[in-house]
UniProtKB/Swiss-Prot annotation:
InterPro entries: Leucine_aapep/pepB, Macro_dom-like, Peptidase_M17_C, Peptidase_M17_leu_NH2_pept, Peptidase_M17_N. GO terms for molecular function: manganese ion binding; metalloaminopeptidase activity. It is found in: Cytoplasm. Presumably involved in the processing and regular turnover of intracellular proteins. Catalyzes the removal of unsubstituted N-terminal amino acids from various peptides. Mn(2+) 1 binds at residues 270, 347, 349. The lineage of its organism: Bacteria, Pseudomonadati, Pseudomonadota, Alphaproteobacteria, Rickettsiales. The gene is pepA. Its cofactor is Mn(2+). It catalyses: Release of an N-terminal amino acid, Xaa-|-Yaa-, in which Xaa is preferably Leu, but may be other amino acids including Pro although not Arg or Lys, and Yaa may be Pro. Amino acid amides and methyl esters are also readily hydrolyzed, but rates on arylamides are exceedingly low; Release of an N-terminal amino acid, preferentially leucine, but not glutamic or aspartic acids. Mn(2+) 2 binds at residues 265, 270, 288, 349. Keywords: Aminopeptidase, Cytoplasm, Hydrolase, Manganese, Metal-binding, Protease. One of its GO terms (cellular component) is cytoplasm. This is Probable cytosol aminopeptidase. Belongs to the peptidase M17 family.
Amino acid sequence: MLNVNFVNEESSTNQGLVVFIDEQLKLDSNLIGLDQQHHGLISKTIQNKLQFTGKYGQIKVIPSVIKSGEVRYLIIAGLGNEEKLTEAKIEELGGKILQHATGCKISTIGLKLTNRISRFTSQTFASLVASGAFLASYRFDKYRTTLKEAEKFAVESIEIFTDNSTETAKLFEIKKLIAEAVFFTRDISNEPSNIKTPQVYAERIVDRLEPLGVDVDVIGEREMKNLGMGALLGVGQGSQNESKLVVMEYKGGSKDAPTIALVGKGVIFDTGGISLKPSSDMHLMRYDMGGSAAVVGTIIAVAGQKLPINIVGVVGLVENMPSGNAQRPGDVVTTMSGQTAEVLNTDAEGRLVLADAVWYAQEKFKPKCVIDVATLTGAITIALGNTYAGCFSNNDELADKLIKVGEEVNEKLWRMPLHDEYDAMINSDIADMANIGNVPRAAGSCIAAHFIKRFIKDGVDWAHLDIAGVANSNKASALGPKGAVGYGVRLLEKFIKEYT
């Protein structure tokens, strides 16, 4: 794991030294001495716009001209226009710095802060850069037995020179705790589905959360049957692995304080069931539990900080498998709410899991607000691509707050419509509703949201986040490698912290 340290005095023991330059290409007063020490290497570089323009995110790694000393490389990082810098951009810049240092096999890095930024304190700037670097240090390679030497290399430490190391370290400790929650979400999402069975996943939740003071209850199929959870159980009935409902309760607030419920879809592997998916990308369905992982990660972050709020998480863990005992297209299931659903397509299974999970959360905990998170529909990816998750809500204020926070942490949300005409499209001839719409390929993500909405009680504020397009990525980003992104943890943690 990357070591991050904050020190008041500059050290010369790091192999790489990072300096920040904005698009005005002017040396900070605190860089003049360093530039002279390195025989004008920094000033010569920024005077040549073919080499360096100062635009945001540009990283220039230059071998040091000093024969003696530990510093082998100067790393010049572009800030761009200071007025356009955001916290998210500063974090991503930290990630880019770490990635370039890794590529150049620089094992220890020192960061010299700029004094040209007025919109952020030096402590905030330093903690954000460190947070981005820490997030970018994540790896999931435990099943690789033949890593090449270049693939094994990792930056060992980052040392940031700041005038208030104690205060900066406190800020970073919170960000590190949140990043470690993101790492749990990434880890469990990346885990192969033959390893993370519902039972194993549930055990990992217990092991991670109980030491943080979170009450965790793992409900098996017998109890779910007694509760009337026919929708969730129907999805998992084709699998040899027993379905689980994991209930997490963190009581940090007063007894009369309102409760927020987070509900996550945890389809451990989704073949589509009898309505079988195409085989080409089916291996990616190990990520179909990304919503549940985001819920668990959020509770790790909240409980780890001991925030004074009451929050519950409910995740339905199932496998959607074809077998002689699998659910059939045309089956009718009775949900915990008593409403019935005709299963016209067994590959529209996530909404069935959520139907019972959100109802359970409302019945048991009487929350003021329910936010469900799910890799629910391919339709949302067609609509929004891999940049935005879809946000559906019955409350404008709730939706606006989520969208605002999403912009701030760069986990973006786009408000999607709810409408009575969409709701009418899930009416069934033989049951209370069908799990797909009656117009083929029309408004798929909206239809799915309306299915869940039928299980939200009157007076409960509700938001549904369809994260199918953003939960995993086929390419690396500034904050992590390809694979599971950990989307939703930082969004929900900040939403809960700021608005409850």
